[in-house]
């Protein structure tokens, strides 16, 4: 599959020497990926622990692993992210979109996500390509970590490769349907309430909630 991805990316006629180099590159990437699997398993175990500890409805970790759609999405993301780090084309996005179609959770493989990551319920969660998420972060359903705007080039096309999504520091909780846009920072230990639109930095430990309706 890695070889196929590399061939697809080249999209040109290949000489025998080209094919040999691509095959050697694919084999090395596969070896590097396999070597990383024990560490990936360790990281995924922290995600399972976070999901189990944070959900009183979870009876055991086996239930979390087998039944929770967020674990499927996070597992696919962690596989895809490592492949992307190894410069494997196309396949990482296919892997995360498979989880997206099955779970309703859209995590771009380019996002950087720390350990003990939890998504509760999960439907409608969107995590953009340049998002950075620290350790022990919990998101609820419908959360969007998105971009606020796209700088355009001289042809009015969006400029690619610019950091445009939020930075979420350690120990942050973001409740359902919160929308956080742009390259802003949500500080360590902050709590973002549900149904809130955030476009500015949030200080560490701050609690941001909707204003109470006036009588």
What annotation goes with each model-predicted range?
Residues 1-94:
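Terminal amphipathic alpha-helical/low-complexity segments used for targeting or macromolecular assembly
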């Amino acid at each position: 599959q890695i070889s196929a991805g590399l061939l697809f990316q080249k999209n040109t006629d290949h000489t025998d020497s080209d094919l040999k180099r691509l095959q050697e590159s694919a084999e090395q990437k596969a070896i590097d990926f396999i070597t990383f699997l024990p560490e990936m398993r360790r990281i995924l175990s922290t995600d399972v622990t976070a999901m189990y500890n944070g959900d009183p409805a979870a009876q055991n970790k086996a239930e979390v692993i087998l039944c929770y759609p967020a674990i499927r999405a996070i597992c696919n993301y962690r596989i895809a992210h490592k492949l992307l780090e190894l410069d494997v084309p196309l396949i990482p996005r296919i892997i995360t979109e498979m989880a997206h179609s099955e779970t309703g959770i859209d995590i771009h493989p380019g996002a950087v996500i720390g350990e003990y990551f939890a998504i509760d319920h999960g439907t409608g969660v969107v995590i953009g390509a340049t998002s950075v998420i620290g350790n022990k972060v919990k998101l609820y359903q419908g959360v969007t970590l998105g971009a606020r705007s796209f700088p355009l080039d001289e042809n009015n096309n969006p400029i690619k490769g610019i950091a445009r999504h939020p930075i979420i520091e350690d120990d942050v909780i973001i409740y359902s349907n919160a929308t956080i846009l742009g390259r802003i920072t949500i500080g360590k230990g902050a709590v973002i309430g549900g149904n809130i639109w955030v476009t500015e930095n949030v200080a560490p430990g701050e609690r941001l909630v909707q204003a109470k309706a006036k009588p």
